[in-house]
Amino acid sequence: MKKILLSVMAILAAVYMYAADVQVKVTYYSPEIVRIEKSAGAFHRTNSVSVIMEPQGTPAKPKVKVSVAKDGTVTFTDAKGRKLLTEGASSVEAITEGVDKGFWTVSQEFKLDSDEPIYGLGMLQNGKMNLRGENRRMIQSNTEDYTNFFQSIKGYGIFWDNYSPTTISDDGTIVKLASEVGDEIDYYFIYGGNADGVIAGIRQLTGEVPMLPLWTYGYHQSRERYKTGKELMDVVKGYRDAKVPLDGIIQDWQYWGNNYLWNAMEFLNEDFPNPKGWVEEVHNLGAHMSISIWQSFGPQTKPYRELKEKGLLFDFITWPQSGISHIWPPRRDYPSGVVCYDAYSAEARDIYWNNLKRLWDLDIDAWWMDSTDPDHTYREGDFDQMSAMGSLRSVRNIYPLMCVEGVYDHQRAESSDKRVFILTRSFFMGQQRTGANTWSGDTQSTWEDFRKQIPLCLNYTLTGAPQVNSDIGGFFPSGYNKPGQTQTCSTNPLFQELYVRWLQFGLFNPMMRSHGESSRREIWEFGKKGEPVYDAIEKAIRMRYKLLPYIYSTAWQVTSNHDSFMRALIMDFAADKKVWDIPDEFMFGRSLLVAPVTNALFTSTEERKWSEETVNWTKPAYTEVYLPAGADWYEWHSGKLLKGGQTVTAAAPIDRCPLYVKAGSIIPLGPDVQYAKEKPWNDLEVRIYGGANADFTFYDDEGDNYNYENGRYCTIDFKLRGRTLTIGRRNGSYSGMPAFRKFRLVYTDGKRTVTRNVEYSGTAVTINF
């Protein structure tokens, strides 16, 4: 079949081809990114919500080449002519009735190799790393959130730019994307050569990742819910008294009062009598306050009345359905009247922020935007409702992006003194640009659900969105309660073991956050100091704070260099086919290999039930870990050097998550602190792991404003070549920057360990070990 190679044509903004039944439009956005549009008629796609990049015209030397057959089928090759992907059949069928009349249902097939893994798609609770064979209708929900993007082990990615419910189907050779409403077929092919390159491309296309506040990388304590201001304050004081680090405290719902006042965005509950002073007291203890806000409103609230007057409320069933709180199942004879707002409307987003500003003026630090999916009990005809951007069907999946970006944009316009931080439950492509971290919804407190969180977080990261976490311990632990009682899960050894292992996984998430219903999660609920479970929890939290300089420096690489916190093994070791489908190991940053313990090793069962069994938490326990080929590995706790490409038996006592360091790594460790900003980073231990060359850029700034965007930060480059370490000249400065730093250098090569102390004033230093 004759094809035309578009990449050798003249440099144009776009190239149009006319096939038998469809027109094809090819637009280069960069040498690596090309947009394909197909239409049965004229091209009239409105502006993309996700894509913010402008096309650059057909490059003289594209890294991806496009050819179009007479029937409109597109093939992609790399610069050397190696085939990357070929389309299969496409379909653009007119919708002839209903509110979407005049639009089309659109679909496109892609021919993949049968043994070609793909990754991404958002948050799937399926426990799989390789997502071949998926067949599902993708629509945002509580525990599963989708973005129409996948990337291949071949180093390319596909972003299907459509916001309606979309079905992915895969018969083993054909992956098909089919959307219920669209202007046209519209997708982007991104060739990065590897996973990092694809992520760089999707962020260039849809938005870069801003820096989050330093404190957000500390430990967060939450519960469903703190019922009084005093109860929350007692938790913050309890951590300070126990000398266990804490940075974030989170206030869940109903600080506004009853369900008719749902999400009033003000403190109307008499159990929170002095919110301004309360927030100030939290700050005086070195902690930060996040607060729950929703995308729905009760009928007795100010925002409800304003939005209703403007016709900016939807009429579908959302949560809570009952006006009476704390009754399950809900009393539908007392309907709450709670409804979601039309976040697709710029005017509605203005109203939302103008009401949220009451909380902003209290000096709240961060927003917990719950139910951005949103919660929706579907009825026939709901998707026929009209939003400010068209039918709800046509834009359903970008609802979370509209909600979250609305708050981000308004806060950025309000002030540059406080970085935006949003914890949210749902996601769509582009949301990585909004200062948001997405959690995986209301998971069950089971080992099975815990195991699912690891590949979920990794596949989410492979969509280009690096900020992700889950409810440590799972949201629903009630099966562990003593029969007839509540708040007893934390005394149940079955839940204790699960909680500790989930916490150890959370230690290596971008956000370390404990949350759930039916049981208090504060450290003292699990025992007391000197007891194995308590000590294991404290050890994990303290290690998080030791790693803060490493984590924050990684955050800078995420912002400045398209990096990722949680790295699926295919990102660094794609040449090792054994890692292509490993769902329970990952890199945290570029240096740390994490292998969470995902099975019960100390208790007798993984069932969710009450147990009073006596557990020997000190007995030896072991698990198997695969060390990827392509590197040697140091065991974190012992320093033992191991070869890659083998499975090893790792010690896994209750207070230890198997952890390895890639040979050729530099890891800065911070001081012992009670909160992230308690002490400056002027006295650090720096661990240097030899056996390969190493590069690391240490980053520091003012911690919680946007001055870094204007160059107010500093970086220090560490380079290891053989046994010689060079600490480069300090680049940049910021207000409050230490003029001098002490570095305690600890070098190991598996045979010997050498320690050096360096007084660093900002000029380059060379050290030989």
Sequence positions of predicted segments:
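Catalytic core of carbohydrate-active enzymes
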Residues: 408-420, 427-439, 460-470, 475-724, ...
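Catalytic domains of carbohydrate-active enzymes, especially glycoside hydrolases
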Residues: 234-254
